[in-house]
């Protein structure tokens, strides 16, 4: 019977793929057996793959991986366990793109190893995905640390945003990636009524991580960092850093390195 043969061919082509995804060391396989359980029939008896099953598969993998946007536990330099509410760093699976790739691979009907697509990537792959290098800033202690491969590379006093002036306190209780980095840079403040920047500052090292907030040296501070300076004479929100420390951090971090502020 021709229609039966046709149906068998359709079923075989729908269930012919064998796809493997490896997530955190665990292999998930979509094979003939799985695909048979994903089949649905319409009112005319035609078979297709149930999209909700494909979606659920990707969602389940993404839920194991995603850290971006979720609160993050962190152990501070002093060994305290804290929770960072704002988290703009981490892994985030691009669910739509990953679903598209899954559908394409199923249509191709062959055996292949699959990779998920990501809208955000972290530096590390373990549960604590900070990677080999991270920067830690304590507002209360006005201190910044930089770690590389578990070793302390820099410990320095800093001056953060001026808490006596509205809108200048450095945003804290979060984790952000370094967006970009450059040397010999002139920072410009917001424009005043005449269209001129409110301030300009030339810096040797510039590492923004949260909008206009970044780590940089500042010659005008001389050797005055740390202590209570931030309470009355702090920055516009940035992390003012002694030159040598800024240089070492600049040479240690890369774009995407996480910065933790609390």
Kindly give the residue locations of the regions a language model identified.
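Surface-exposed, secretory/extracytoplasmic low-complexity segments enriched in Ser/Thr/Asn/Gly/Pro
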Residues: 1-176, 180-199, 205, 253-255, ...
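Exported/periplasmic cell-wall-interacting domains
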Residues: 56, 171, 189-262
């Amino acid at each position: 019977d021709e229609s039966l043969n046709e149906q068998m061919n359709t079923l075989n082509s729908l269930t012919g793929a064998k796809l493997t995804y490896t997530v955190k060391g665990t292999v998930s396989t979509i094979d003939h057996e799985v695909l048979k359980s994903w089949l649905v029939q319409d009112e005319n008896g035609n078979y297709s793959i149930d999209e909700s099953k494909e979606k659920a598969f990707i969602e389940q993998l993404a839920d194991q991986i995603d850290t971006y946007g979720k609160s993050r536990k962190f152990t501070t330099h002093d060994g305290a366990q804290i929770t960072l509410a704002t988290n703009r760093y981490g892994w985030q699976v691009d669910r739509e793109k990953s679903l598209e790739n899954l559908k394409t691979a199923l249509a191709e009907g062959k055996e292949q190893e699959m990779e998920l697509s990501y809208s955000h990537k972290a530096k590390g792959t373990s549960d604590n995905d900070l990677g080999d290098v991270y920067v830690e800033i304590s507002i209360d202690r006005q201190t910044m640390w930089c770690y590389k491969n578990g070793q302390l590379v820099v410990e320095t006093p800093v001056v953060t945003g001026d808490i006596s002036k509205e809108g200048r306190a450095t945003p804290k209780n979060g984790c952000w990636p370094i967006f970009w980095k450059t040397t010999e840079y002139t920072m410009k403040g917001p424009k005043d009524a005449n269209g001129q920047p409110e301030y300009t500052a030339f810096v040797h090292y510039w590492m923004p991580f949260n909008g206009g907030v970044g780590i940089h040296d500042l010659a005008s501070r001389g050797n005055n960092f740390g202590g209570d300076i931030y309470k009355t004479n702090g920055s516009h929100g940035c992390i003012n850093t002694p030159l040598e420390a800024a240089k070492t951090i600049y040479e240690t971090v890369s774009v995407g390195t996480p910065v933790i502020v609390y």
